Amino acid sequence: AANYTLISDRIAPSGAVSGAAVKADGYGLGVKPVVRALWAAGCRDFFVAHPGEGIAVREELKDARVHVLNGPISNAINDYVYHDLIPVLNSLDDIALWQHACRDRNRKFKADIHIDTGMCRLGLDLTETQTLLSDAPALLDNIDVQLVMSHLASADDVNSPQSAQQLSMFKSAFDKLGIGKQSLCNSSGVFLGPD
């Protein structure tokens, strides 16, 4: 909780808020005591890798926003809906799957959009991002987009130009989409500057 408080205090003047990654059983510390401590410190957004981890967080915190980084899984859609988990959509296929889930249930469900700006791990690649930007209203019609996110690949290297390049790409995509809130920085990125 001390790290969360340090980062939250650092970004508070900008109006930004922080979330916490609690993957892998709270990084081996036990997800339930970790999320309780973070909740007490003011954290409301929790990031996990898989829906099972999200369910564990939801069982402990009924009012938290629980984001599942690895995207929706077709055979677990009911788990996302029932437990109010927010999938991170990492590809056009993820967007189509979540769009279908929303239409089937005649409801708008929350989701985050992840754009790969250089991490090369998760997120829409450049081609998919261009497709999304050119047809966002149709592709995201039934989706309640909460966050548009990316992840800094070299934030721990203050001399790397990659973070500035990623920030520029991310801002451009976010501005064109015009929906949701921005989420870019990992812990190290917060200390690179106010942008």
Language-model-detected regions and their locations in the chain:
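Conserved phosphate-coordination/catalytic loops
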Residues: A1, L89, P161-A164
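A charged N-terminal "starter" segment
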Residues: A1-I86, Q99-H100, D144
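A cross-family glycoside hydrolase active-site/sugar-binding cleft signature
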Residues: G19-V22, F47-A49, H67-L69, V88-N90, ...
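Active-site loop/helix belt of alpha/beta enzymes
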Residues: A24-A37, A41, H83, I95-K110, ...
